[in-house]
Amino acid sequence: MELNAFSSQYFPPIRFFADFLSQENPCIDVYENYQKQTYRNRCHILSPNGLQKLVVPIAHTGKRAMKDLQISYAQDWQKEHLRSFEAAYRRSPYFEYYEDDLMPIFEKKHKFLLDLNLEILEQLLSLLQVENKFSLSESYIESPAEDFRQAYDAKNPVEDLPEYTQVFSEKIQFIPDLSVVDLLFNEGPQSIVYLKNLKQQ
């Protein structure tokens, strides 16, 4: 079976989900080496002051496979991320609809980044009402049918996405390709329609 390779990501961006849902056999490559300053351990949300970058700290340096990467709890980053999500989305139309499914994630202390990211991915797929059909690699994927592992650049997010109403749209110009939670909290059940339309572009 030919696999389509994706990286494990922390509250992945919208474009990731559009691509992920368009593939027959999406596979998370858990053996790829961790790469700094990527969505593997960070996400972008829209705060009252504009784009906000949230980063999960890593416990060690040097090359490691994603499956072996441990999270650092030297600082209470979970409280910071939880407060940031609440400040950003408490006023959004669907925050109360989804908060009981997403906010408890910040109360768990996963040892490995991969486990945290996989729980987030599974929960987001459930909220999008999409069948959980992805697999995990058994080794590094050398020759995937399609390779999406480098497709999403946290430094240069995708800019040509259709606009939807964001929480602070009255004072902040639309920011595309934030974490898919931005779409969920603002569009709710219609989020899947937006993603399917992106798949066709």
Predicted regions and their residues:
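Residues lining hydrophobic/aromatic ligand-binding pockets adjacent to catalytic sites
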Residues: 1-201
